[in-house]
Amino acid sequence: MYPGEIAKSTPDKPAIIMSDTGESMSFLELHEYAERMANLFQAAGLKPGDHVALCLENRMEFLPICWGAHYAGLYYTAISSRLTAPEMAYIINDCGAGAFITSTYKAQEAIELEDDIPHVFLRLSVGGNIDGYDQLEALLAEQPITPVGPRVEGADMLYSSGTTGRPKGVKVPLPETALGDTDGVTALLGLLFGANQNTVYLSPAPLYHAAPLRFCRGIHKIGGTVIVMPRFDPIELLESIQEYKATFMQVVPTMFVRLLKLDKTEREAFDVSSLESVVHAAAPCPIPVKKQMIEWWGKIIHEYYAGTEGNGFCYCNSDDWLSHEGTVGKAILGTLHIVDDDGAELPVGEIGGVYFESDGNFEYHNDPEKTESAKLNNGWSTLGDIGKIDEDGFLYLTDRKAFMIISGGVNIYPQEAENVLTMHEKVLDVAVFGVPNDDLGEEVKAVVQLLDPGQASPEVERELLLYCQEQLAKVKCPRSIDFRDELPRHPTGKLYKRLLRDEYWGDSESRIV
């Protein structure tokens, strides 16, 4: 179904509630907002299959805007609200967006990138005035709530890493199905996690991430209520569970860690008995952390392994995990294969590249080389991880290819920081990679070879950190920099980053489980 169908039977039922203010939007209001939004897109000249982009913090309008694009049969790209203006402009241009929507929260960046997105003909601001942008609220008031045609499903097109370190859009074919038809994610929400029209789904993560956005969309299709937190805070999370009697929630392991660091008296002060299903993914979860969470909340914790690409899906419940500690689950969509560097399949227990054999079809937008590199000749595709499968068919992730960093559930691609730091006048060579962090799982570390090694000092470290932060979102930048007289490079120019990385991991090992 879709919000309009739900509204026919329960028009006043809350579809969205902001956890901090209690502000709510009913299913009828959500449907009418989406219809007006779809009409606005169509009136501007956008047609099914075209692209729109949005960069918003977690706020009431986020999901209704996405639903408007969905109603209009458009691709919609949600951009991280942490990005700088140049990073935002790159994604807006790369996805080919004809419309861009942002809020006063990103007003400075919106103004900075105005001249850098020449193909965007519809520029809209939410929550106030931004120079060069039309106010969305005023334009929506002029739009009808009549359906636009043709009535087909839109789709998100979210961004992953590219071969150069730049993000790349993960594009799947438009569904070509009637608006409201059940999709794979919505079906899984009901099948695996028991989601239904009575579900109260608490969403503490940024909505621009694939899983939160798709889970919220699926809950709306089922007819459940979505509670949106502006940001994650452990106490506020527990307060929201108690206040709204949340039944379902998706988190990342860092949130588990922050919750467990609360005093026991603080944890026990809140009633979380309404929870029926808690799902985690997106980052490594230390075995002791997961054990403690199961002890606290019970066997309601689920885990999955999948990607924005939608090429496969592994899953385990608490019982499965307790009998196979460290697993990320069994494949329930697609068939798992572990292969060596030549593409030959490996036996049980052997470590190699993790591939899915499935009907899932995706491409990296404007990057055929990356698309090809993610697939074998037989059609199997990978998310770039390596791991092993046990005799029961459970998957264990062992390491990450290309040393992608996962810090607090956020994927960070070190090539971006390397490209920036390399351009600094004092830098001769640089390597960026993840090092252990008890709270975040990993943090970003840089090792730099200076043009003049004698300049190595805390002052130069601060200079380089600030230089990076001026050009990239802070989350992508190193937290610290070490200096070396020379970095380990092969005569061909290949950097042996593993040699550097392993020094910092020590007994922790470069392992995900």
Range-by-range predicted roles:
Residues L83, A89, F100, E239, ...:
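AMP-binding/adenylate-forming catalytic core of the ANL superfamily
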Residues S24-L28, A155-D183:
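Conserved AMP-binding A3 loop
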Residues A15-R59, L63-C66, T84-A89:
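Conserved AMP-binding/adenylate-forming core of the ANL superfamily
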